Amino acid sequence: MQLYPAIDLRSGRVVRLLQGDFAHETRYAKNAVELAKHYEAEGANWLHVVDLDGAKGEVAGAIENLNLIEEIARATSLKIQTGGGVRTEADVRQRFGAGAARVVLGSVAVKTPELASHWRDIFGAEKLALALDARADPFGVYRVHTAGWQETAEAELFECVARFAAAGFKHALVTDIALDGMMAGPNVALYVKLKEVSAELLVQASGGVSQLMDLRALNANGISGVIIGKALLEGKFKLSEAIAEVAA
C-alpha cells in the first residue's frame, strides 16, 4: 500500500480544514518545504499537496502555493501528486511544469468527464488522478461533492468509479467528507466496496486515519493507497512507523 503524506497549502501556509470547511482551519507552524524534506527523510517517496486557494479560486494564494510546489520539487526527490483548482489544460501543464508527477482532477472531471478523458489521452492515465469526494445523503447514498465540497453533484460515487474505470483512468483519490480531519478512523467498508465495484481503478483512501491500526485495516483489505495528513502533523505516529506498519 502506497502512503501519501499530505500537505495542504493556503497562502503558502501549512493548514488543515475540518470536513473541508474553510471556517474551521488549523494553521501549523511548519514550513512546507522543510516538512516535505522531513517526510522524505522518514522514507516517503510520494507527497500529496493540495492547493486550497486554487480550489477556492483565490489567485494570489494559488500562485504562492504553486511556487512552493516548485520549491519542494527542487529541494527533494519526492514524486508530487497535487490538486486543487485544476480547471483547464493550462492548469494541468502548469502543475507538471512546477515538478508534479501526477495531477489530481476534481470538479472538472465530475462535471465534464469528456474533458478529463481528453486529458488522459494527452498525458496518460498514470499522470492523472481523480478526486471523488463524497458524503452519504439521508438515504445512505454517497453523493460526490464538487467546488471545494461546497456543491453536491447528482453523481453517485459508485457509478462514478465504475464509469471512470471503464473510461481508462487508473487512479482515484476518494474522501469520505464526514471523516475528513475528524481523526475517527477511515471508512474501511466504503473502500472495500469501491474495490469490488472496480478493481481496475486504484483507490487512495483519504479521511479519518488517526492511528497505525487504521493503516493495518486498509492494508489488510488490499487498498492501494492512503493519504495521511492531520495524524502526521499532530504527531499521532511517525511516517517511518507507518511505512514499517504496511511493509510488515
For every predicted segment, state its role.
Residues 2-6, 46, 77-81, 101-104, ...:
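Structural preference for beta-strand elements that scaffold enzyme active sites
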Residues 60-70, 153-158, 184-192:
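Charged helix-capping and loop-helix junction motifs
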Residues 15, 19-23, 96, 100-180:
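Conserved anion-binding
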Residues 8, 39, 47, 95, ...:
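Conserved, mostly hydrophobic/aromatic
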Residues 46-67, 107, 173-184:
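Glycine-rich, proline-tolerant flexible connector loops at the mouths of alpha/beta enzymes
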Residues 76, 80-102, 189-226:
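Catalytic cores of alpha/beta
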Residues 28-40, 87-93, 153-163, 215:
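Short, acidic/polar
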Residues 94-115, 176-179, 207-214, 221-241:
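Glycine-rich phosphate-binding active-site loops on the catalytic face of alpha/beta enzymes
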